[in-house]
Amino acid sequence: NIYNNYKNLFSNFEFISKEKRNENLIFIFTGQFLGELHAPTKLLLERAYHLKKNFNKEILIINTSELLTKKAEIPFFESTFANKVDSYSNINQISYRDIEIPFYQSNTDMPDENEILNILSIVQEYKPYFILNIGSGNLTADLCSNLVTTVSFPTTSDIAISESQIHIHRSELTNKDFNLLKKTNIDPTSIVIS
C-alpha cells in the first residue's frame, strides 16, 4: 500500500523515546486549514488555544495540505479537490483570539517526498511530546507516528483510520466499529472515548 511504500522510503528515522521529547511542545497536524468559519479548522484552533492557554504548552500547527490533493490526479468524472488558502504558505503564525500560534503550511502539492522529509526532519529536530492529528487520512502524520506518539482526532463521528498510537472516538464502540478496527488492524485498546 501507499503508506508502506513511503514508510520504507523514510525508514532511516527512529522513534524518539518519551524521555528525549520536549514535554512542553505539541505539534498539531491537519490536512486542510481554511479559517475560523471552517468547522474542522475552528476545532483545531480551539484545541491549540486551550493547550496553550490552559496547559502552557508551546504549539506548532502544521498544515500538510494533503486533503483531496490534486497530486497524481485520476481523471474521474466530476472529481473534487480540497480548497487551500495559498497565502497561508507565506506566514509563520496564526492569530486566534488573544494569542499567536506558530504555523507552517506545505506549499507543494502533497504527497511530495521532499516535503514529507522536511516535516519529518522538523519533528526529529524539535522532538514534540506528541502530535495531535486533527482529521484523518494524513499520510505525513501517519509517518510521524514512527518518530513520536501521534493522537488521531477525527472531525467526523467515524473512527479515524490511521497509524496513530492513540485514537479519539466520540462515542462508545459499536459492533460495526469493532469490525472496522479488526479489518484495519487497529488495536481496540488504543481507542479513547471522549
Feature annotation, model-predicted:
Residues 67-77, 140, 174-180:
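Short, charged/polar "capping" segments at the starts of alpha-helices
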Residues 109-124:
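Alpha/beta-hydrolase active-site loop
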